[in-house]
Structure formats: structure tokens, C-alpha cells
Amino acid sequence: MPWTGIFSLSAVTKKKMKTGSQKAVWGRGYMKIAYKAFRPDLSCQAGGSTYQYQLQKWNEIKEAKCRETGFHCAEDPLDCLSYYPVWEQAVYYMVAADGDIDEDACDSKIACTRLRLLKKMTKEAYIYVALVYMVQHPTRNWNANVKRERAVADRNQMAVSRGKNPAAKGGLGAVLGLAKETPDGCGITDIAVCVVDGKRYLPDVFYDVNGNEVLI
């Protein structure tokens, strides 16, 4: 399934089912699929010191408590940007969180004692899974990177717009995410991911969730 395009909720459901199968394969007990940002060499702070994460294995630590100890990740991909806000200076992964798990009461952060890196995320994939998170949890607090109705991204950056009639624009190379809500509630009816390529999607032009130009 491509990461860019106009998505029906049936497609989102299929993607959710695929993620669920990963839980069955990788999990040992109460496991969650989440997202984590790292330095380019896959190192990150863990328990007050720098930890070097490894691919293709379970990384393990003794204790997990949010904001204090353990490996930290987030259910909402966009929460990772609070800690590593510059895409070009970090790498972002889908991860499996397992072992002892502690969840934060403030945002979607998770602390765990076992963590496995599953998939490195492109910008397009990252915005897509962020939109899927909104579909699955429409009433949860919005990440600060999600803008109501209108969002704007600089060249090669990202923007996410959510609302009754969301629209977004960006410079060349920007990735735009859109989530349309129900007329009388906060549930999500449609999502879209668009890359400003200078051909199908033009720089500094607002687009709606159907990929159509919007005059604002």
C-alpha cells in the first residue's frame, strides 16, 4: 500500500489489521506498536545515560518509568517531534514496546523495558501513521504539530491539518497530511497524504482532503 494518496477508512482498517499481526508475532505479553526518534547513529537517552540501540534484536533495560527510566517511545508518531523536531537531524522508527510498560498521563509517551526497531519511517509514512492514530483515537489531545483547518509547511518540511474542511500547502518537497472530521463531531471520515512534487501538487497552493486546489 503506498503511503501517499487519498485514503478510504477501509484502507486504514486494513493497515491497522497488519499492525495488529505484528503484535502477535513480536509480542511477549502486553506489547504495543509505537514510534521513536533517534540520533542518526541510533543512539538515544535512556535512564539518564546514552544507549546505543541495535537493529534486528530486542534492546533490553531493567526498569521503566515515564520521564525517568526505561526506553521511551510514543503511540502518536507526532509526539516524537517534541524531542527530535528536525527531521534531517534524526531517524524515526516504528517500534515494538514490550516487557514492563508505563504510560504517561500527559501525552502518548510509553516507557518500556524491551524495545525492538521494526521499520524506518519516511516522511510520507510518518504522516500517514500519524493520521491513522487520529482515526483510531479521535478524542485524544491534539499534538501541537496538528493545525485546525489550515496548515502550512516550508520547503521539504511537514504540515498536518485537521478539521471540518482541512486544507494544507507547502514548499517544494513538503509532505502534507489532512484529516477531515465528521460534520457534528470529532471522528475522522477521510485522510490524505500529499507530497508537493511541483507536478501533481504545486508549491504554495492549498489542497483539500480530496487533493483538489482550494482558494483561500
Where are these regions (language model features)?
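Short, glycine-biased loop/turn motifs at secondary-structure junctions and
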Residues: 2-216
